[in-house]
Amino acid sequence: MEGSAYTERTLSIAEALHARFPGLVGTVIQAYLHRSDRDLERLIDLKMRVRLVKGAYAEPARLALQRPSEINEAFIRLMERLLEAGRYPAIASHDPALIRATRGFALRMAIDPGRWEFQMLYGVRRDAQLALAREGYGMRTYLPFGVDWYPYFARRIAERPANMFFVLRQLMTR
């Protein structure tokens, strides 16, 4: 999902498509937006697939959490709700702490790894992607393409600058 200016329109379009093509449409929730708890409940009620991300756009404090610790707390809260009630949710993060929190919660709650998946950007933390897949977790690697692939990729790097080191290391080890 793009910036907050598009959130309501994106969700409305996703809901309309989901009504027409049930089970074939999903959308993204950005954990850092203040509205995300309500949006997530709406999507769970509709039984729509949801991909959870932290959120990567500069948003004002009136719309979004600003502190990384608060964003992580929101991500974990939403992740737990999604794993409990979601329809094959996607937990999209490269953050080792959030991956550990997700694995730990799923294990404590006996939520089968076949009911959800991790998602990561192509070229970022490939070692973690392979390890998660070997451990039996669903692992989807996504690759931006088209005319706007580079701005999308740059936002992922800006969201977590350490990702650039992961990408560079992957390029150097090939």
What are these model-derived regions, one by one?
Residues M1-R174:
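Positively charged, amphipathic and often flexible ligand-engagement surfaces
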